[in-house]
Amino acid sequence: MRVALIDYGSGNLRSAAKALERAARDGGVAAEIVVTRDVEGVLGADRVVLPGVGAFANCRRGLQGIDGMVEALAEVALVRARPFLGICVGMQLLADEGVEYGRHPGLGWIGGTVEAISPADPALKIPHMGWNSLDFQADSHALLAGIEPGTHVYFVHSYHFRPADPATRLASVEYGGPLTAMIGRENLVGTQFHPEKSQAAGLRLIANFLRWAP
């Protein structure tokens, strides 16, 4: 199995690659983890991981700046329906648009907008950074197998995904109000938290992704 980790200048590639490799090894999954910005490499992948750090618009431009990359990702994820995982801004890019430093189009694969976090408690600082506990909205999802509600995972973000369809929100986190922590439909899943930084729970989610057959 070939897993493409997309290199477009906006992701924690080293830590994400190491987490994917460890999850595969510990989980007994035969997986080749390939960090790539090559369109043909993406088209040949069995699974795709899209990381992302920084501003929404910069990440979108980074993807668009690789000739044919957005089209290749759409072919693999939407047409061939191969498992796709977006991490942090990689998840946010699945939305219709982001409003960080203006209005910018997302990939539009899961309806919704990416908006600034505005906690009800003014004492809460932005960005939302550190460990926080997950609340599950979905009855079950394959990527959450073996992970209990209330499990702590690691976040660093100032913007959040507000889904058009609440049913696509798989998990939330409380930070002066509920924020989307995990989103998904069909073969697409995104996490606002960083599984590669979330220790045992993060490795479990990644291993689940590597075994996932949506």
Curated annotation (Swiss-Prot):
Top-rank taxon = Bacteria
Write out the GO MF terms.
Answer: glutaminase activity; imidazoleglycerol-phosphate synthase activity; lyase activity
Q: Where in the cell is it found?
A: Cytoplasm
Glutamine amidotransferase type-1 domain mapped to chain residues:
2-214
Keyword list (alphabetical) reads: Amino-acid biosynthesis, Cytoplasm, Glutamine amidotransferase, Histidine biosynthesis, Hydrolase, Lyase
Which residues does the entry assign to the active site, renumbered to this chain?
Answer: C88, H194, E196
Q: What is this protein called?
A: Imidazole glycerol phosphate synthase subunit HisH
Quick check: keyword Hydrolase in the entry? Answer: yes
Oligomeric form and interacting partners = Heterodimer of HisH and HisF.
Q: Say what the protein does.
A: IGPS catalyzes the conversion of PRFAR and glutamine to IGP, AICAR and glutamate. The HisH subunit catalyzes the hydrolysis of glutamine to glutamate and ammonia as part of the synthesis of IGP and AICAR. The resulting ammonia molecule is channeled to the active site of HisF.
Which pathway or pathways does this protein act in? Answer: Amino-acid biosynthesis; L-histidine biosynthesis; L-histidine from 5-phospho-alpha-D-ribose 1-diphosphate: step 5/9
Q: What Gene Ontology cellular-component terms does the record carry?
A: cytoplasm
Q: Which PANTHER family match?
A: IMIDAZOLE GLYCEROL PHOSPHATE SYNTHASE SUBUNIT HISH (PTHR42701:SF1)
* Catalytic activity, EC: 4.3.2.10, 3.5.1.2
Reactions catalysed: 5-[(5-phospho-1-deoxy-D-ribulos-1-ylimino)methylamino]-1-(5-phospho-beta-D-ribosyl)imidazole-4-carboxamide + L-glutamine = D-erythro-1-(imidazol-4-yl)glycerol 3-phosphate + 5-amino-1-(5-phospho-beta-D-ribosyl)imidazole-4-carboxamide + L-glutamate + H(+); L-glutamine + H2O = L-glutamate + NH4(+)
Q: Which terms under GO biological process does the entry name? A: L-histidine biosynthetic process
Species, as recorded = Rhodospirillum rubrum (strain ATCC 11170 / ATH 1.1.1 / DSM 467 / LMG 4362 / NCIMB 8255 / S1)
Record keyword Hydrolase present: yes
